Amino acid sequence: MIRQRTLKSTVKATGVGLHGGRKVNLVLRPAAPDTGIVFHRVDLDPPLDLPADPYAVCDTRMCSGLEKGGQKVGTVEHLMSALAGLGIDNLHIDVDAPEIPILDGSSGPFVFLLQSAGIEEQKAPKRFLRVKKPVEYREGDKWVRLEPYDGFRLDFSIVFNHPAIDSTSTAVSIDFATHSYVRDVARARTFGFMQDVEFMRANGLALGGSLENAIVMDEYRVLNADGLRYADEFVKHKVLDAIGDLYLCGHPLLARYSAHKSGHALNNQILRVLLEDRSAWEIVSFEREAATPPAVAHQFAPVLAAA
């Protein structure tokens, strides 16, 4: 049986919010089967619960944020991506600020944090959202599509017309039947341009951004002294974001995701298009090994092998 997962123990981290620029304390706590991923704004009185939900996504300018009752938790996508990559279904996330800390701008520190807490398989079958027919969403020359697939594959292409990005691969395919989230995706950092910083900060964004938590470029080159972590780090970060954005549906997807110039807004829209067509998806579990697609068995191999 492919089982649900949570953490073995509670783990804590402290970092800076990318957009607010203030200190943020984060606590990740185990949760019972079928709880899902639930964010808790513990700085509010009373504390506010915000479950992962594509219909709660409110602000997609520079990140994915959840909103409830006028209160928000922003920049959830890197943590959500790490949870999806490690197959964690159930978790309580306590945060004392309106956003998740950015850490190093990738999912790598979240992966380390989660693995250090230990991952526990639970006595309940993992529930997948299987795409049954193609759905698509377009805005101008940007598009995103979900199609039936016995596993989880992402094909992504980007266009930025910038020499530092154009000199790298601008398209990538990641299939978790053969690729590893931890090895191939998790370390890709968010990126931005110096000329955008003044505008963003005037709008209350990226106040905590620095070379410590993003790839930063001027008009011609990457400014980070250590360069890139992957030859295709830019497009891989877009894949990392997409994995986190899609996991807000509450279940791992069995689907092929294809996108061109997509971002948080389009990723959220394609989930809404999918969920609103009840004939386009179903919830499935794999309680018998013989019925489990090989790609799923590989991606969600027992924890000892995955960790």
Curated annotation (Swiss-Prot):
GO cellular component, one term: membrane
GO molecular function, one term: metal ion binding
Source species, domain of life: Bacteria
Pathway of action: Glycolipid biosynthesis; lipid IV(A) biosynthesis; lipid IV(A) from (3R)-3-hydroxytetradecanoyl-[acyl-carrier-protein] and UDP-N-acetyl-alpha-D-glucosamine: step 2/6
Active site: 264 (proton donor)
Cofactor: Zn(2+)
EC number: 3.5.1.108
Binding, Zn(2+): 78, 237, 241
UniProtKB keywords: Hydrolase, Lipid A biosynthesis, Lipid biosynthesis, Lipid metabolism, Metal-binding, Zinc
Disulfide-bonded cysteines: none
Biological processes annotated in GO: lipid A biosynthetic process
InterPro entries found in the cross-reference section: Ribosomal_Su5_D2-typ_SF, UDP-acyl_GlcNac_deAcase, UDP-acyl_GlcNac_deAcase_C, UDP-acyl_N-AcGlcN_deAcase_N
Reactions accelerated catalytically: a UDP-3-O-[(3R)-3-hydroxyacyl]-N-acetyl-alpha-D-glucosamine + H2O = a UDP-3-O-[(3R)-3-hydroxyacyl]-alpha-D-glucosamine + acetate
Main function: Catalyzes the hydrolysis of UDP-3-O-myristoyl-N-acetylglucosamine to form UDP-3-O-myristoylglucosamine and acetate, the committed step in lipid A biosynthesis.
HAMAP family from the UniProt entry: LpxC (MF_00388)
Family: Belongs to the LpxC family.
Annotated protein name in UniProt: UDP-3-O-acyl-N-acetylglucosamine deacetylase
Organism: Azoarcus sp. (strain BH72)
Upper taxonomic lineage: Bacteria, Pseudomonadati, Pseudomonadota, Betaproteobacteria, Rhodocyclales
Gene: lpxC
